[in-house]
Amino acid sequence: MSFSSTAKAEVSKKLSQNSCCARAAAAAFLKFTGNIYELDGTFSFKTSFENAQTARSFFLLMKNGFSKHCEVSIKKNSKLQKNYVYTIFLPPSSDNIGVLKDLHFVRKGAKEYHLSFSLKEELVRKKCCRKAFLQATFLSCGSITNPEKMYHLEFDVKTKDDAEFLQKVLKSFEFEAKIVERKSHYVVYLKEGDRIVDFLNIIGAHSSLLELENIRIVKELRNNVNRLVNCETANLEKTINASMRHIENIEFIERTIGIENLPQNLQEIARLRIKYKDASLKELGNMLEKPLGKSGVNHRLRKIDKIAEELRKGGVVHAKPSHED
């Protein structure tokens, strides 16, 4: 089972059954997975789910929260023959108007009620109701990409109004969700791993939260190791390139004016550099008659580089034997 499916199975078991929260959750389920039908003053609705536990949660929500007994049908997914689609249907009845009134999906006209299938602020005034709304929204149209690959949580909704309503609910929990239009739908998404962890905490998916945190820790450790290896490799390459440059410059000086014409202090380090090509700067410094640290050795070698550069330009180097740096 995918990470997203596992998280949904966990949330399905924790869907709130409180009356106010039940209204917020039912509204999200119907809005994002269902359709409402109106015929001769009667109303019915149908929702479809690919997750059996989510379908069961909605069925129980209607039964316990609204005293409605829905019909359930199961058939194979036409696109994915291995999966099933669970359809929950509430048959037409004038009594169903009460449910839709609770969900603010109908408005009263001069003589009768009319369908108004849009989400209302009244549903999510309380924090507990906003949590229930997010639980049902995640179960209905949410998905989380495999965190081993990337951090991405998204909700696929039909209209811009739905996307902005969801964005506003997420904003109440300090989530800065983005909206992007994708073909005929709108996608509300979060990309930061720590924010997805916070979202899982809010909807009660604590086991999935811990799994994601473990994945994040391993990925961060792996990235740190790779960064360290890359840094060490870069430093090693830099050291090797510098050593090769020094040797090349010293050999050039030997062919032109001769190492013996360098100041005494530079002669000493030049001969050691040629003799011990693989030695580090620290090792070279310890070999000197008067030992030097890495920075002192590097300073002398840079002087040799400068002399070689002047010689290549055709300049004249007046070497003065010296023990000074």
From Swiss-Prot:
Name under which the protein is recorded: Probable cell division protein WhiA
Organism: Caldicellulosiruptor bescii (strain ATCC BAA-1888 / DSM 6725 / KCTC 15123 / Z-1320)
GO MF, one annotated term: DNA binding
Record Pfam families: HTH_WhiA, LAGLIDADG_WhiA, WhiA_N
Entry similarity comment: Belongs to the WhiA family.
Biological process according to GO: cell division; regulation of sporulation
DNA-binding annotation, residue ranges on this chain: 280-313
Swiss-Prot/TrEMBL keywords: Cell cycle, Cell division, DNA-binding
Its biological purpose: Involved in cell division and chromosome segregation.
